[in-house]
Amino acid sequence: MTISFKGLARGVACAALVLAALPAAAKEFRLGLITPPPHTWTKAAEAFGAELSEKSGGAHSVSVFPARQLGNEAQMLQQLQTGALDMAFMTVAEVSNRVPNMGAFYAPYLAGDINHAAAILRSDTARGMLAVLPQEAGVVGVGFGSAGMRQILSRGAVNSAADLSGLKLRITPFDPILDFYNALGAAPTPMPLPAVYDALANGQVDAIDMDVELINVLKYHEHADTILISNHMMFPMVGLISARVYAGMSDADKAMISELMAKHVDSTLDVYMVKEPEWTDALTKVGKTFKRVDQSFFGDAIAQWETIWADKAPSLPELRKTAADLQ
């Protein structure tokens, strides 16, 4: 068989054109969350994946794994660090377990309401706190979102903070909220979301720290007597990319993926600003005792928290100043 030089050259040229048309690093990314499929964060993750596929011409896609399918947040953060997981929408709570300065976001009454919380999370001060994540946690933070403000749901009556003393109270497992409830004399009990409904129903816990979205959507109020709207803490989320995975991206992909993820993470703030008043109003109609309280309700527990976290979270004074400026 004889192959002419011209024929070979044409074949090489055609192959080169085909290869040039292919993306340099087409990939299906895996993104993990702890939230269930109907949750705002999960919907934002799915929207991010859809837009990334569109903007990359189908080169990139995102498979979303909600509801702890890839493990709890501590496990997913470890997977991000090794590169076994590409991306996550994760509570800042879990990140603060590795980077204590992030605990500043959980200062009691740092934000007055969800609108104020959104403004704080969109500030230069907040975004600047992401810079250390590659070095300290092995992840790249692209921006903040949020869940709703924290409230308290109790199986029994709560007329004062003293009524929380000794109660087994479900929390997300991280130090800032643990310290807050310890200061109140409660018995904070870490527990994953899937276990909360049954734990309330059978009395395994007496109360829970939760936001109004999940109190509504997962119907936690069905096994409670008192809904305490306290807005005592914000509960931010951060969009994360494995630093190992990020390092292997082209500059163009780094820019596109970071921008799109930041956009959809940020969109959760807009959702909560609209929906949180609606979810709160819905809880006034479920036939439970409904109370609104402010920071005076918690007595000196807030000052105790500040004493503990003053050294752990050096960004706290600047973040409080930013919060005051944005009121």
Swiss-Prot record:
This is Solute-binding protein SPO1773. Solute-binding protein that binds 3,4-dihydroxybenzoate and 3-hydroxybenzoate (in vitro). Probably part of a tripartite ATP-independent periplasmic (TRAP) transport system that mediates solute transport into the cytoplasm. One of its GO terms (biological process) is C4-dicarboxylate transport. One of its GO terms (molecular function) is carbohydrate binding. InterPro entries: DctP_fam (IPR018389), TRAP_DctP_sf (IPR038404). 3-hydroxybenzoate binds at H39, T40, W41, R150, R170, I171, T172, D211. SUPFAM superfamilies: Periplasmic binding protein-like II (SSF53850). It is found in: Periplasm. The gene is dctP. The complex is comprised of an extracytoplasmic solute-binding protein and a heteromeric permease formed by two transmembrane proteins. Keywords: Periplasm, Signal, Transport. CDD domains: PBP2_TRAP_Siap_TeaA_like. PANTHER family: DICARBOXYLATE-BINDING PERIPLASMIC PROTEIN, PTHR33376. GO terms for cellular component: outer membrane-bounded periplasmic space. Residues 1-26 form the signal peptide. Belongs to the bacterial solute-binding protein 7 family.
